[in-house]
Amino acid sequence: MRCPFCGAEDTSVVDSRVSEEGSRIRRRRQCTACGKRFTTYETVEVRFPQIIKQGGNRVEFNREKLYTSFARALHKRPVPVGQVDAAIERILQKLLGGGAQEISSRTIGEWVMQELYKLDKVAYIRFASVYRSFEDVGDFQEVIREVQASPSSLDDEPPG
């Protein structure tokens, strides 16, 4: 690795440590030419699949959109942050674990609905109202009836 101070090509690793979360390696390096030390970080490059929107155009996966969807649906709901993070992590693992290079936004939306249903029924209904484009009160009432009719369990799948 090139020294950031003198530009020399030859540096040596003095110390390596794995970060607390285990996702990065911190390396202390020393330049063999000027003797100065510097730190580098090594991380895994993760490539999420392209998202195919309903209109057919393709966009890069945006992790922030996923977080925002959960935040809006769960706004002022009594759901611990750790549970929300775990739900988002499950969706990210599905995205990476499937090995697909492309995935439809509809599939991701369904995964979000499944996770919200497990976390909080009100948040599920909020998200469903936007995701399914509810047009009147009847649409809300129908989903509420479906939610009320299904047994309550952490492993529930959303109705319909």
Curated annotation (Swiss-Prot):
Zinc finger motifs (unnamed), residue ranges: 3-34
Family stated for the protein in its record: Belongs to the NrdR family.
Keywords associated with the record: ATP-binding, DNA-binding, Metal-binding, Nucleotide-binding, Repressor, Transcription, Transcription regulation, Zinc, Zinc-finger
Extent of the signal sequence: none
A matching Pfam family: Zn_ribbon_NrdR
Organism the protein comes from: Nitrosomonas eutropha (strain DSM 101675 / C91 / Nm57)
Protein name as it appears in the record: Transcriptional repressor NrdR
Occurrences of domain ATP-cone (ranges): 49-139
Note describing how the cofactor binds: Binds 1 zinc ion.
Cofactor: Zn(2+)
